[in-house]
C-alpha cells in the first residue's frame, strides 16, 4: 500500500529525545548485552512536557477501564486523585515491554496481563437503542473499555500521527477528521465525483468489522505507522507499536460480573482503543487494496479508490470485491453500486448532491434528544443541534420526525402520570 497518501509526522517528541540517549538496537532486546548497554529505566518525568496535553484530550467522563475503575468512576476522577500513580504506571509499562522484548510475542493474553504488558479489557453493552431484530438475535453492541494506562501509552505513541490524519482528512484515504457540516459534505461528495470518473462507486457493509479484524491487519497498521513516523522497522518505536498491535489482538476480557475470559483466536479491534477510528480506517483501506490485488485488479486511482471512516467506506467497485474481502475474514453483508452517485450513502448519510445529505435513520438521534429533560439548561442547545443535523431532511420527512417526537413525548407523559 502506498503510504505516500498519508501525512508523515516524525516520531513523537518525547520518544525522539529518549531513544537518542540509548545505545544498542532491537536485535539486543531481552539480552544481557542490551541490559548492560541500556541507560536507567524510563521514568515518568520524561512525559512532563506532554502530560497536560494528553490529559486534556482524554475524555473525562469515560470509563477508566479495569482495574483503574477501583480508583474512580471515570477518567477525570482517576487522573485528578491519582495522576502521578497513573503516569508512574505508564513508565513502568514501557519498561516492562523493553524488559521482556521479543518474548512478548509468544505470551498468552493472560501472561501479557500478569507480566504488566497491558491490562484486562472491561466489556459491556453500549447504552444506546438497539433494534428489536438485534435484541431478539442477541446481537448487541459490545464496548471494550481499554484501561486508562493503556489509553495513555497508545496516545503517547500515536497521537501525533492520528492528529495529522485528522487535519489532512480531505487528501487522505482515511477520514477520521471529516465533518458533517456543509463544507465537509461538499468535500466528500466532490471526492466521490472524482472517483466516479474511474468506475462505479459502491458502498459496503461489513458484518461485525471490529471482531473480524485479523492480526496481520493490526500488524500492518503498526508497520505503516512506523514508516509514517520516519523510523526504522526493527527500531524502538516499531517495537512499541508491534506490542500494541499484539496486545489488542490478544486480550483478556472482564465481564460486568467480574468473570474473565481469555481470547483464544488472535485479532479483533477494541472499540475503546484510542486508535480505533484511525486504525480501522486504515485497515479498511488495506483490506480493499489487498482484495484488489488478489482479484488482479489495477490500482492507482485517486485516494487509492476508497474513502474510509472507520469501517464505513465508499470505493470504486471491482469484480471480486465481496469475494476476496470474505476470504480475508470480512463478511460483506451488503454491497450496493451507485451509478451516477444516485443516493449513495456514507457514514449513515444519504447524499443528494454537492453539500446536501441527510441521515439514513433519524431514530437514534431523535432518541438521544428525547432522553434530555426539557428543564435541562442546555435543552435549547440540544434542540438547535438536532435541527441542524436534520437541516437537509425533505420537508415531508421532517414533519414525520416532529409528529413522531410529539407522540413519544405524549406517551412518556401518560406513562409518568399513570405511574404516579
Swiss-Prot record:
PROSITE patterns: RDRP_SSRNA_POS
Start and end residues of each RdRp catalytic domain: 199-325
Reactions mediated catalytically: RNA(n) + a ribonucleoside 5'-triphosphate = RNA(n+1) + diphosphate
EC number: 2.7.7.48
Tagged with keyword Secreted: no
A single BP term in Gene Ontology: viral RNA genome replication
Swiss-Prot/TrEMBL keywords: Nucleotide-binding, Nucleotidyltransferase, RNA-directed RNA polymerase, Transferase, Viral RNA replication
UniProt entry tagged with the keyword Lyase: no
Post-translational modification: Might be cleaved to release the mature protein(s).
GO molecular function: nucleotide binding; RNA binding; RNA-directed RNA polymerase activity
CDD domains listed in its UniProt record: ps-ssRNAv_Barnaviridae_RdRp
Functional summary from the UniProt entry: RNA-dependent RNA polymerase which replicates the viral genome.
Family statement drawn from the similarity comment of this UniProt entry: Belongs to the ssRNA positive-strand viruses RNA-directed RNA polymerase family.
Name recorded for this polypeptide: RNA-directed RNA polymerase
Source organism of this protein record: Mushroom bacilliform virus (isolate Australia/AUS LF-1) (MBV)
Lineage, opening ranks: Viruses, Riboviria, Orthornavirae, Pisuviricota, Pisoniviricetes
Amino acid at each position: 500500500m502506498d503510504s505516500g497518501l498519508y501525512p508523515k509526522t516524525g516520531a513523537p517528541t518525547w520518544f525522539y529525545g529518549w531513544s537518542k540517549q540509548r545505545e544498542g538496537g532491537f536485535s539486543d532486546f531481552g539480552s544481557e548485552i542490551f541490559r548492560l548497554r541500556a541507560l536507567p529505566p524510563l521514568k515518568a518525568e520524561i512525559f512532563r512536557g506532554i502530560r497536560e496535553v494528553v490529559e486534556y484530550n482524554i475524555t473525562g467522563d469515560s470509563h477508566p477501564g479495569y482495574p483503574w475503575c477501583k480508583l474512580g468512576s471515570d477518567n477525570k476522577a482517576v487522573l485528578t486523585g491519582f495522576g502521578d500513580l497513573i503516569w508512574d504506571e505508564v513508565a513502568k509499562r514501557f519498561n516492562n515491554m523493553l524488559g521482556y522484548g521479543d518474548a512478548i510475542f509468544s505470551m498468552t493474553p493472560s501472561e501479557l496481563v500478569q507480566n504488566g504488558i497491558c491490562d484486562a479489557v472491561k466489556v459491556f453493552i453500549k447504552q444506546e437503542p438497539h433494534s428489536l431484530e438485534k435484541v431478539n438475535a442477541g446481537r448487541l453492541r459490545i464496548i471494550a473499555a481499554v484501561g486508562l494506562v493503556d489509553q495513555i501509552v497508545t496516545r503517547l505513541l500515536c497521537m501525533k500521527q492520528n492528529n495529522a490524519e485528522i487535519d489532512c482528512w480531505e487528501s487522505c484515504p482515511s477520514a477520521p477528521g471529516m465533518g458533517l457540516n456543509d463544507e465537509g459534505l461538499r468535500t466528500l461528495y466532490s471526492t466521490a465525483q472524482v472517483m466516479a470518473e474511474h468506475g462505479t462507486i459502491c458502498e459496503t457493509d461489513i458484518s461485525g468489522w471490529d471482531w473480524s479484524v485479523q492480526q496481520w491487519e493490526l500488524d500492518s497498521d503498526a508497520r505503516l505507522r512506523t514508516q509514517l513516523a520516519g523510523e526504522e522497522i526493527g527500531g524502538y518505536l516499531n517495537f512499541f507499536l508491534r506490542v500494541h498491535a499484539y496486545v489488542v489482538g490478544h486480550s483478556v476480557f472482564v465481564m460486568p460480573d467480574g468473570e474473565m475470559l481469555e481470547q483464544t483466536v488472535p485479532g479483533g479491534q477494541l472499540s475503546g482503543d484510542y486508535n480505533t477510528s484511525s486504525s480501522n480506517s486504515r485497515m479498511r483501506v488495506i483490506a480493499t487494496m489487498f482484495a484488489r490485488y488478489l482479484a488482479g485488479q489495477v490500482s492507482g486511482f485517486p485516494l487509492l479508490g476508497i474513502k474510509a471512516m472507520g469501517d464505513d467506506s465508499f470505493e470504486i467497485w471491482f469484480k471480486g470485491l465481496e469475494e476476496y474481502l470474505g476470504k480475508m475474514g470480512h463478511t460483506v453483508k451488503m454491497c450496493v453500486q451507485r451509478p451516477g452517485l444516485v443516493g449513495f450513502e456514507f457514514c449513515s448519510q444519504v447524499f443528494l448532491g454537492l453539500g446536501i445529505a441527510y441521515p439514513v435513520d433519524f431514530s437514534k438521534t431523535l432518541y438521544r434528544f428525547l432522553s434530555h429533560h426539557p428543564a435541562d439548561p442546555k435543552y435549547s442547545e440540544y434542540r438547535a443541534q438536532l435541527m441542524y443535523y436534520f437541516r437537509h431532511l425533505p420537508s415531508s420527512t421532517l414533519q414525520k420526525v416532529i409528529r413522531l417526537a410529539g407522540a413519544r413525548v405524549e406517551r412518556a407523559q401518560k406513562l409518568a402520570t399513570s405511574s404516579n
